[in-house]
Amino acid sequence: MKFNRMTLIASPTPKAQKAAEELKKLYQWYPLEEADVIIALGGDGFMLQTLHHLLDNSFNLPVFGMNLGTVGFLMNEWRPSNLLRRLIRAKQFTVYPLRMDGQTVSGEQKIYRAINEVSMLRETRQTAHLEISVDGRIVLPELVSDGVLVATPAGSTAYNLSADGPILPFDSGMLALTPISPFRPRRWRGAIVPDGSIIDMRVVDPDKRPMSAVADQRELREIANVTITLDRTTPLHLLFDPNHALDDRIAREQFRLC
């Protein structure tokens, strides 16, 4: 695909800023409001910040990231040369964020979105007690654990994988429901549910066992209940080099030993 107006954003790290200065000398750049594609320099955390900025400001631009961070799962290899050619050959992936509708013990209501995962986490040394429902049916009357998370395929290789959750193929149409350090039920290690599911979580005894809900980096404390769905009204578009596309990375990640 061909793009005519690139805009450049970079992480504040010295490495990313140096790379940005190099690119500014090589190509013509436009303000975000006039651009048709975003070039993002940084790591996965910066990419998440960029995508959330697009969500919050209703921008619908594809993003081509180049890794100047650590892992760079959502990024392409950093190479300053042939950028326009890479954009023409790039493979586009559309990802949909999770929508978290949360209500606190005091009645405050918030809506947050997450590209990777929504996590429910205990706030104190007390283990969390949660009731979990899927599509209006109680599937776990009481989960005793440090918490639980719901991950998208794009986020299944992040916190979800660290919690021993499954890696989801990009086109699986599924979400991972993964407990964090579960105690009871002893044999429950999580579930995979269709991405059209409505997942409800209710905190049992929130006064004694308070919990927070976290949508990527956004936290809502003293949570009473949350509803999690996939928001298909706000698509996000990521661009990848053909030989390093997101679905290939997710597939390869399943066979990594370290």
Curated annotation (Swiss-Prot):
One of its GO terms (biological process) is NAD metabolic process. The active site is at D44. The keyword NAD applies. Its main location: cytoplasm. The keyword NADP applies. NAD(+) binds at D44, G45, N116, E117, D146, A154, T157, A158, Y159, N160, L161, S162. GO terms for cellular component: cytoplasm. Its cofactor is a divalent metal cation. Keywords: ATP-binding, Cytoplasm, Kinase, NAD, NADP, Nucleotide-binding, Transferase. It holds the Pfam family NAD_kinase. Its EC number is 2.7.1.23. Involved in the regulation of the intracellular balance of NAD and NADP, and is a key enzyme in the biosynthesis of NADP. Catalyzes specifically the phosphorylation on 2'-hydroxyl of the adenosine moiety of NAD to yield NADP. Belongs to the NAD kinase family. This is NAD kinase. It comes from Zymomonas mobilis subsp. mobilis (strain ATCC 31821 / ZM4 / CP4). The gene is nadK.
